[in-house]
């Protein structure tokens, strides 16, 4: 059978719940487990200036449990979607959960939309993406903007039905994520946008009706993909499919979700062009295509280089190649008369923070890196910290960069060592932190311990200083984003902004108002649920070892204290997940399978900036220096955004029509 299921009957059967009816007890238990994992989330209450609505996750989980008890929820799919939407309302890209029924089918359609301004300054309107392509060719007479979707005003439908589930903390970033991403092809992610994919969720009806301003209508029919990793589609009833996807245990060679093949089947329609096919050939690039250096063709912009970085998801040898490519690119730009640099981080969702720190140090080799983080001081973390801090001492502590729960391993935000004499000194809670119970401030990790020649941070540890003097001054560097910059990308932009580097961002909601360059998560560290399970497992082993040690046997008071910690750990900890995705039954302590692809996570640590050391950076609004709306040319030829950004940021107003939206001046 084709991986792409277009039969409407299949979709309707799925929607009607024939695919699976779920055991209420299991899903109620799932909500209980989610609440235990939720206690690891670091952020507290947001200040009034925070743009996104806040959500009480524990209260939301309680309401879901009540719906299970009173029979309001009738299927596993309904339950999983409710839980997914609740988690999404936190608008925290580090807070995610992979739920079994949502991994079975992925719904999408082939009519992406885009938001286009005629000149980059007038308010944009919604168009079918293919119409934007026609607009760029100059044939505008027959083109009409989209005004309604399923009887609702189009922008309202998109923002209230879809954008709210996308996990970005900024509403403009969520809006941009609805539409095609030209950089998605570099990282192998879906390129048509969340309106076309609906985050894989059933959109609520088998037909979506688009109405245009000229009165014409277009019917869009969602289809379902069957991931090849789910194996053959040979299930004859919903119960069998439910058991394969959601219950531990299988007699087949491969576990559901682990069959060889692509994560998603190829759709039956053409996706918007993305990645290398839509950008010019770079002067320099790495083997993964994540780092690319360009020169601008415009005669007036020959002194501008563009360094495009689409992801920081890498490690090991890829990190070393990344570092070498950045150095080669900056050296080439400087030696070829480039005095200005555009750093394009559009669509960059983050990844490994070490390459991000390395990038900053190559741009500003004379500036030390400051990082400030805190975790929530909870009972469970206290137990883990006591277990790790008692076990790892001296040289041993240097070997455990993660978890950051050994006091001996922690350094100050300015990288001072030996500042925490005990676990209590690190755990706190900090008496100067108002409101929430938070740890004392400390760095992401020790750069001296983390930086190696294999995975370098320039000038730290065993990694030499790759570039010894600045090649570009702050006023000659500008960061370009689409607001979706997240995690490590956010950390890099924050470090650059602290040096005076300016930012320019494209798109966003159709309103003449500021927009943030960093609209994604600005947390200090993401922990996957498997990481949490691994740390809990290790802590149990350490405490059991301490409990039976010779020292404990000789000291009944110490043995009693360790036994108390071990009991508390067992009481507070969530059930373990398999430490390797899709492991066999004996690794499960939970009745339902979830996190099939290992993507579930929480934000373990908050990040802070020197100007405000008590409000998590996630909640601080930072408008870009310049905002532009996308023109048809910017949509079809995304490299044209670099010309617009360079003229606005480096050339001043006198260079012509390339201006920022008029709420702000450069």
Swiss-Prot record:
Biological-process GO terms, alphabetical: proteolysis
Entries under Pfam families matching the protein: PDZ_CPAF_rel, Peptidase_S41
Keywords: Glycoprotein, Hydrolase, Protease, Serine protease, Signal, Virulence
Domain of life of the organism encoding this protein: Eukaryota
The protein's annotated pathway: Mycotoxin biosynthesis
Signal peptide: 1-27
UniProt EC number: 3.4.-.-
Alphabetical list of InterPro entries matching this protein: ClpP/crotonase-like_dom_sf, PDZ_CPAF-rel, S41A_metabolite_peptidase, Tail-specific_protease
Glycosylation sites: 70, 214, 234, 555, 612
Gene3D superfamilies in alphabetical order: 2-enoyl-CoA Hydratase, Chain A, domain 1
Keyword 4Fe-4S applies: no
GO molecular function: serine-type peptidase activity
Region (Peptidase S41 domain): 303-504
Membership in a protein family: Belongs to the peptidase S41A family.
Record function comment: Peptidase S41 family protein; part of the gene cluster that mediates the biosynthesis of the phomopsins, a group of hexapeptide mycotoxins which infects lupins and causes lupinosis disease in livestock. Within the pathway, phomP1 and phomP1' are probably involved in the processing of the phomA and phomA' precursors. The pathway starts with the processing of the precursor phomA by several endopeptidases including kexin proteases as well as the cluster-specific S41 family peptidase phomP1 and the oligopeptidase phomG to produce 10 identical copies of the hexapeptide Tyr-Val-Ile-Pro-Ile-Asp.
Protein name: Peptidase S41 family protein phomP1'
Organism, as annotated: Diaporthe leptostromiformis (Lupinosis disease fungus)
């Amino acid at each position: 059978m084709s991986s792409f299921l277009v039969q409407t009957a299949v979709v309707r059967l799925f929607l009607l719940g024939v695919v699976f009816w779920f055991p209420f007890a299991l899903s109620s238990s799932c909500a209980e487990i989610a609440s235990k994992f939720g206690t690891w989330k670091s952020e507290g209450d947001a200040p009034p200036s925070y743009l996104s609505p806040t959500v009480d996750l524990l209260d939301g989980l309680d309401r879901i449990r009540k719906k299970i008890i009173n029979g309001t929820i009738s299927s596993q799919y309904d339950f999983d979607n409710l839980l997914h939407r609740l988690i999404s309302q936190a608008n925290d890209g580090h807070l995610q959960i992979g739920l079994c029924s949502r991994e079975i089918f992925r719904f999408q359609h082939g009519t992406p939309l885009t938001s286009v301004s005629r000149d980059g300054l007038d308010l944009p309107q919604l168009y079918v993406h293919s119409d934007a392509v026609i607009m760029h060719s100059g044939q505008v007479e027959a083109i009409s903007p989209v005004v309604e979707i399923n009887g609702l005003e189009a922008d309202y439908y998109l923002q209230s039905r879809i954008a709210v589930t996308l996990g970005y903390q900024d509403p403009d970033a969520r809006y941009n994520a609805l539409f095609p991403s030209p950089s998605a092809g570099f990282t192998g992610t879906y390129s048509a946008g969340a309106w076309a994919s609906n985050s894989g969720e059933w959109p609520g009806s088998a037909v979506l009706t688009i109405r245009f301003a000229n009165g014409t209508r277009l019917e869009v029919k969602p289809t379902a993909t069957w991931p090849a990793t789910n194996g053959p589609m040979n299930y004859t009833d919903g119960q069998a499919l439910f058991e394969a996807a959601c219950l531990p245990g299988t007699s087949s060679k491969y576990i559901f979700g682990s069959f060889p093949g692509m994560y998603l089947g190829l759709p039956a329609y053409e996706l918007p062009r993305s990645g290398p096919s839509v950008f010019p050939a770079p002067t320099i690039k790495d083997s993964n295509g994540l780092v690319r250096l360009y020169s601008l063709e415009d005669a007036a912009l020959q002194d501008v280089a563009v360094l495009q970085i689409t992801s920081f998801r890498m490690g090991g040898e890829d990190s070393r190649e990344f570092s070498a490519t950045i150095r080669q690119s900056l050296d080439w730009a400087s030696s070829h008369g480039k005095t200005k640099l555009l750093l394009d981080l559009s669509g960059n969702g983050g990844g490994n923070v070490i390459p991000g720190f390395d990038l900053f140090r190559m741009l500003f080799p004379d500036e030390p890196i400051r990082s400030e983080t805190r975790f929530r001081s909870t009972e469970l973390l206290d137990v883990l910290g006591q277990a790790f801090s008692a076990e790892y001492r001296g040289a041993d502590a240097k070997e455990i960069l993660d978890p950051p729960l050994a006091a001996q391993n922690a350094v100050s935000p300015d990288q001072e060592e030996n500042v925490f004499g005990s676990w209590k000194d690190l755990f706190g809670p900090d008496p100067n932190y108002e409101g929430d119970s938070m740890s004392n401030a400390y760095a992401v990790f020790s750069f001296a311990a983390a930086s190696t020649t294999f995975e370098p941070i320039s000038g730290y540890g065993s990694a030499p200083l790759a570039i010894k003097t600045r090649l570009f001054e702050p006023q000659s560097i500008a960061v370009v984003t689409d607001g979706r910059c997240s995690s490590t990308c956010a950390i890099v932009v924050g470090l650059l902004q602290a040096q005076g580097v300016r930012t320019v961002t494209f798109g966003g909601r159709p309103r003449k108002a500021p927009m943030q360059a960093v609209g994604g998560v600005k947390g200090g560290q993401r922990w996957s649920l498997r990481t949490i399970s691994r740390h809990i497992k290790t802590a149990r082993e350490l405490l059991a070892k301490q409990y039976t040690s010779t020292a404990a046997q000789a000291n009944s008071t110490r043995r009693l204290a360790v036994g108390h910690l071990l009991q508390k750990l067992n009481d507070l900890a969530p059930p373990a997940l398999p430490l390797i995705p899709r492991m066999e039954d004996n690794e499960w302590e939970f009745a339902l399978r979830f996190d099939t692809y290992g993507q579930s996570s929480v934000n373990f640590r908050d990040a802070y900036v020197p100007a405000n050391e008590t409000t998590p950076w996630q909640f601080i609004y930072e408008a870009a220096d310049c905002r532009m709306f996308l023109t048809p040319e910017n949509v079809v030829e995304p490299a044209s955004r670099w010309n617009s950004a360079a003229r606005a940021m480096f050339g001043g107003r006198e260079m012509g029509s390339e201006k920022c939206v008029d709420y702000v001046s450069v």
